[in-house]
Design a protein with these regions (language model features):
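Phosphate-binding loop of NTP-binding sites
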Residues: 5, 92-222, 226, 230-238, ...
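Active-site beta-alpha connecting loops in nucleotide-dependent enzymes
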Residues: 50-53, 309-312, 328-399, 426
Length: 438
């Protein structure tokens, strides 16, 4: 518990700023920054600290760069009239976000899941944006810092919020729901992601289900995967729900003649820029939620056709002689299997899969990498290339490389003419570096 009157080294007493005072400052300066290198004029700079740095030491630099106030938690960095002292900067940011959320009379849709949550969030936001003023999570700012930043970016004229929630430990989704207080929830799936932090698949299910628990406790509305037996069982006795199930859309047909997904729906042909059968359910979720909120069918189709993946997520990149599908943002056994199966099914002259290591698998890492190596070399993909220490240790007929630089040298001399090339791996592998040579 902090002292009621913290002191600077010179003995000067400094009062803590109350939440009400902090919120009054936010209303005057409704822009929040946490990076002193990205200061916007008249913002509030929250001097967050990490394991290897003291954010308070950047407070004065943020002020010089144009911040209205710096929020600090160390009295020695106090500058009268320019800093606001709080017991803990991170908690102050989270409390401010919750306080702001309580004053926003808008519905918030929150979603989580092992795979597809960022793409689904962006599709939902694009569809709802055809009718409403929507504020959605930027990129994947979906953690204990990103969620409050998303909430604080919602202004009085915001009509719907779409908040993505990420977690790699139990209890995190519950904490994020406490801030966002969602009125609607959706879990994309339960997969083999962050197994190390969650302690196995059962831990993943328990952790992600905290979203539905928070929604049901508040008697709010749930969107759920009807074909997922886990979700079906958990929600069997809950009435306030809407199912998302491709089987409910008999009028939606999925074309396999093109590598990117093409939907026929209600007399419309929707040519998307998304790769992979696994994105079909994400499109269905956006359609179902769009129709639930009364977005016209034509507008939904326009939004889905116009959506372009970015940030290395299922990006289709055309080259003169071949086509790349760059999915280098993240990977786990569930998403890797789905991507490989889709690559094997598309109609293309030749196919190459370049796969990078999957991280955060804990004690199952060797087993899961061996499974993916065997799958990739057994489903009709012409060329399989594996890169990373985990994949290099597998027993496989595929070409293996222990690091990216070795692979770049090999790729520079490789003929990929007429190939569809899937590039997929965990974020830490940074496989987008391969674009320097292909």
């Amino acid at each position: 518990v902090p002292e009621p009157y913290p002191k600077k080294q010179n003995g000067q007493k400094v009062n803590f700023t109350s939440l009400e005072e902090l919120y009054a400052s936010f209303l005057k300066h409704p822009s929040v920054c946490t990076d002193s290198r990205k200061i916007t004029p008249n913002c509030l700079f929250f001097a967050l600290s990490g394991p290897n740095f003291n954010g308070n030491s950047f407070a004065s630099a943020a002020l010089e760069a144009g911040a209205a106030f710096s929020i600090i938690d160390k009295p020695d960095f106090y500058i009268d009239g320019q800093t606001l002292l709080v017991p803990d900067v991170l908690i102050a940011l989270q409390d401010l976000a919750k306080h702001h959320r309580n004053r926003l009379n808008i519905p918030i849709i929150s979603l989580t899941g092992s795979n597809g949550k960022t793409t689904t969030k962006e599709l939902i936001a694009a569809v709802l944006g055809q009718k409403f003023k929507v504020v959605a999570t930027q990129g994947n700012l979906n953690n204990h810092i990103g969620v409050p930043l998303t909430l604080l970016s919602m202004s009085p004229d915001t009509e719907i919020g779409v908040v993505e929630m990420g977690a790699n430990h139990q209890g995190e989704i519950k904490m994020l729901c406490g801030m966002a207080q969602p009125n609607y929830g959706y879990i994309t799936n339960f997969g083999k992601a962050h197994l190390e932090g969650f302690g196995g698949v059962e831990g993943v299910i328990k952790g992600k289900s905290e979203l539905y628990q928070a929604i049901t406790e508040r008697h709010e509305h749930i969107f759920y995967r009807a074909e997922d037996p886990i979700q079906e069982e958990k929600l069997a006795n809950y009435a306030n729900k809407t199912s998302i199930d491709p089987g409910q859309f008999p009028e939606i047909e999925l074309s396999r003649k093109e590598p990117t997904l093409v939907l026929s729906w209600s007399g419309l042909s929707i040519k998307t820029q998304l790769f992979g059968d696994y994105n079909f359910i994400n499109l269905c979720a956006a359609i179902r939620i769009g129709t639930y909120f009364g977005v016209p069918i034509q507008k939904i189709a326009e939004a889905l056709s116009a959506y372009t993946p970015n940030n290395n997520r299922s990006q289709t990149l055309k080259r003169d002689q071949y086509t790349l599908v760059l999915d280098a943002y993240n990977a786990n056994p569930s998403s890797m299997s789905a991507a490989l199966k889709h690559l094997s099914q598309i109609e293309a002259p030749k196919k190459t899969a370049i796969l990078g290591d999957m991280f955060e698998l804990g004690s199952t890492a060797a087993e899961e990498h061996q499974y993916i190596a065997e799958l990739a070399t057994s489903i009709g993909i012409d060329q399989v290339i594996l890169v990373g220490n985990h994949f290099a240790g597998t027993n496989t007929s595929a070409k293996t490389f222990s690091d990216i630089e070795q692979l770049k040298i090999a790729l520079a001399d490789m003929d990929l003419s007429n190939h569809w090339v899937l590039i997929k791996g965990s974020r830490g592998m940074a496989l987008e570096r391969l674009l320097e040579v292909i």
